[in-house]
């Protein structure tokens, strides 16, 4: 079920990959981080699984971008 939902939001992950650079991250790392982020989002908001609107995209995009920006800040501080 998680993998099916991830396929729906995978485009957001790949767009972020093109916009941001994280040292030593490969495509698989981005996908893994995206799945982990989606899992955490659905744990916090299980109602998003049943919703028919596209609210999950908005929530995921915000959560994932913030996660990537945190990783970039961490990378830059080292």
Locations of the language-model features?
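Alpha-helical promoter-recognition and RNA polymerase-docking modules of transcription initiation factors
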Residues: 1-77
